[in-house]
Amino acid sequence: MSVMNGDIKERVKNAKRIVVKVGTSTLTYANGNLNLGLLNKLVWVLSDLRNQERDVVLVTSGAIGVGSKKLDFKTRPKETREKQAAAAVGQAELMHIYQNFFSEYSQKTAQILLTKDDFKEGERKTNTNNTFETLLEYGVIPIVNA
């Protein structure tokens, strides 16, 4: 987690809705193992924001990296079928870990899997927006795969 400058810190302090993006390099050590200590700190901070009745959305990547480690791939997969297999295994693992950590702080979470088509004008975009708004209305922290 990085240090924020004063302007950003002030905007976050007053924000009703906060979206946090964490990437693979934040989630894992150089050897590919998950940084569970950092993940727990992140979840603690987001849970505390939620306890302040702020809307929180977590955007996370890392599914391919986590899945590759779990499948004992020696290098990052290059073929689509291997990437998809690693992503499927890794996404399930990440959600399991996030749900366990968030439940320690009595937070509700939901997994949101999106494609670029979900943001195009029309019914899909409306449904996507409605899903987010409904989850946030019920105090759920959406976890979005990036």
Locate predicted features:
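Nucleotide/pyrophosphate-binding catalytic subdomain
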Residues: 1-146
